[in-house]
């Protein structure tokens, strides 16, 4: 089976330039119209990690989401944006990162994820609690940010879909599966399989290296990447960064589960990975444990509810941060 990964040098988030780059990126894949049909409800799933570090390249740039939304609308789709941040609401994090003016100009709603229990074909994870909004969407477009990650080495397309696990269920998974990096990586891969994004577009124009996902440093990489196969996308990005896949739990799980593409299966309709090699990508200085103990889960839960139900409403009421 051919697995196409479209790769493009892109240096700018300026609206016109970015829109042109995305058209070029998607054209070999059939354009947005190959993924979105008139009337489709299309979930745009960015990385909305935090509202506390704007400008540090911790989240998918709002310009990327807006440009993709415009292409979806041109194809006749009805885009909406959603995520389940670790702390606070999707709307609150989006507002702090400058999303609202761009989304409002295109009349793009923001949804807060609600959970449902869904069966999988995995022997290890019979059911997963996932976002109803993602599972019920006609089309899911995954919009990850290229970042290092202090627990999982890297966060790319597969890890971004963990944001489709609603609320504090993510913290529970860190407690339940985090003692075994192999099991946690497999859970992330099974989540990605269940969500089954129709298209993944990676924002690597400005990336985040070092002690990510939010305490590292911005780095200009100048890369956009897209594929209908999120596992092929991550495989290729790992190669571009010259990283050992065995050190990345999601990549190791993909290999064990037979999801990594072979060289014969991969095709690159635009740039080839060897033309885009990134030297000296910085990984976290020290990897932190994946597992969360019960006290940390309780603190995290309290912080999440405080931000979502006290701090954010107070900000709306008073107009102050």
UniProtKB/Swiss-Prot annotation:
Give the Pfam families listed for this entry.
DUF362
UniProt subcellular location = Cellular thylakoid membrane
User: Chief location of this protein?
Assistant: membrane
A single GO CC term for this protein reads: plasma membrane-derived thylakoid membrane
Topology within the bilayer: Peripheral membrane protein
User: Keywords on this record?
Assistant: Membrane, Thylakoid
| Name of the protein in its database record | Thylakoid-associated protein sll1697
């Amino acid at each position: 089976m051919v697995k196409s990964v479209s790769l493009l040098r892109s240096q700018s988030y300026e609206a016109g330039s970015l829109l042109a780059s995305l058209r070029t990126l998607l054209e070999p894949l059939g354009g947005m119209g190959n993924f979105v049909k008139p009337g489709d409800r299309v979930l745009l799933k960015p990385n909305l990690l935090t509202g506390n570090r704007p400008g540090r390249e911790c989240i998918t740039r709002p310009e990327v989401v807006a440009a993709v939304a415009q292409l979806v609308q041109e194809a006749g789709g009805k885009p909406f944006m959603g995520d389940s941040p670790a702390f606070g609401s999707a709307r609150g994090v989006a507002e702090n990162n400058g999303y609202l003016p761009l989304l409002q100009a295109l009349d793009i709603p923001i949804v807060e994820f609600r959970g449902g229990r869904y069966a999988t074909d995995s022997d290890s994870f019979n059911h997963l609690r996932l976002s109803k909004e993602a599972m019920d969407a006609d089309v899911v477009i995954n919009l990850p940010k290229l970042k290092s990650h202090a627990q999982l080495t890297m966060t790319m397309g597969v890890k971004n879909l963990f944001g489709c696990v609603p609320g504090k269920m993510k913290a529970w998974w860190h407690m339940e599966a985090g003692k075994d990096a192999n099991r946690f990586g497999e859970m992330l891969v099974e989540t990605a399989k269940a969500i089954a994004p129709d298209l993944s577009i990676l924002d690597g124009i400005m990336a985040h290296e070092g002690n990510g996902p939010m305490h590292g440093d911005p780095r200009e990489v100048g890369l956009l990447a897209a594929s209908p196969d999120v596992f092929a996308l991550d495989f290729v990005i790992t190669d571009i960064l010259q990283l050992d896949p065995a050190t990345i739990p999601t990549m190791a799980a993909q290999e064990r589960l037979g999801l990594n593409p072979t060289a014969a299966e991969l095709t690159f309709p635009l740039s080839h990975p060897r033309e885009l090699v990134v030297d000296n990508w910085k990984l976290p200085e020290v990897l932190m444990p994946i597992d969360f103990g019960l006290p940390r889960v309780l603190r995290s839960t309290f912080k999440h509810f405080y931000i979502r139900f006290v701090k954010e409403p107070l900000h709306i009421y008073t107009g102050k941060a």
